[in-house]
């Protein structure tokens, strides 16, 4: 019928070589890499098209190698060797940098000197969204690494416009857009061609909700942009979340600047069940 739930029956996997369009989503490639060791004779994957969210593929390859899977990696090519018996190992799971982005946004929109601390983050993370630490320097957020913790501190920002290619980390688009709104910066983000096939059409959703603040938002297949708005930031705007956890969390950060209403707040449970609890620790009151 074209939608879940679906029934998958056991079958012998036999594919030897596949060609995948990497411009659609890195998730398709990661899923194939994960099942490849169980395919008799292994699997070769050739990638074509525009590169998208490659750090997530790198994380998948790194994990497979840690559990003993042999992989030959070249540009746009992976050969995964068969490994039927995988030995159990123990390793620590670091915190999610995508979730950290909301706290970067809060600090960016706060007064100079404001700071907060987040736990279990690595400076040498393979997560693509760990780039948030570098990105938010432009917004006046300094990241201080303290072992397995990071301290975010608000310092002076010298910009009033922001341009960036998010091809490697498109999940940051909503957070950055809201940060630019809150700071009154102009915004031009590109590399967003995968956002139309996320939980919702995120480009359209962003345009709809940002427009409620009086912004003239332009979107196309790959980008979103809007001019600086140095005027009064509207209060008590009602934000639709489109069943998308990132819409809820990114716009919730605006509460550091103005009152805001988030519809369907429980949507955050997809990735960050304790988000509202942690948000209140920053001083934002939710009810």
Task: Say what each PLM segment does.
Residues 1-287:
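Structural preference for solvent-exposed beta-strand-turn elements
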């Amino acid at each position: 019928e074209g939608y879940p739930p679906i029934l998958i029956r056991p079958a012998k996997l036999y594919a030897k070589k596949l060609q995948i369009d990497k411009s659609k989503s890195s998730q398709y490639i990661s899923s194939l890499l994960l099942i490849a060791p169980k395919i008799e004779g292994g699997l070769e994957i050739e990638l074509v098209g525009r590169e998208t969210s490659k750090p997530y593929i790198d994380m998948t390859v790194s994990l497979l190698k840690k559990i003993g899977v042999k992989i030959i990696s070249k540009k746009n090519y992976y050969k995964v060797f068969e490994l039927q018996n995988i030995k159990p190992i123990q390793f620590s799971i670091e915190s999610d940098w995508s979730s950290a982005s909301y706290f970067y946004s809060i600090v960016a929109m706060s007064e100079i000197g404001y700071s907060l601390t987040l736990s279990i983050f690595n400076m040498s993370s393979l997560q693509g969204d760990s780039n948030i630490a570098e990105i938010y320097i432009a917004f006046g957020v300094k990241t201080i690494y303290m072992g397995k913790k990071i301290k975010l501190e608000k310092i002076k920002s010298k910009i009033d416009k922001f341009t960036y290619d998010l091809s490697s980390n498109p999940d940051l688009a909503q957070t950055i857009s809201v940060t630019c709104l809150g700071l009154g910066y102009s915004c031009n983000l590109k590399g967003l061609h995968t956002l139309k096939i996320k939980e919702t059409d995120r480009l359209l959703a962003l345009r709809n909700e940002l427009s409620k603040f009086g912004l003239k938002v332009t979107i196309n297949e790959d980008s979103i942009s809007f001019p600086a708005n140095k005027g009064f930031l509207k209060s008590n705007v009602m934000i639709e979340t489109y069943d998308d956890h990132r819409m809820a969390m990114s716009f919730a950060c605006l509460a550091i600047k103005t009152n805001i209403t988030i519809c369907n707040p429980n949507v955050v449970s997809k990735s960050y069940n304790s988000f509202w609890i942690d948000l209140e620790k920053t001083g934002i009151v939710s009810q």
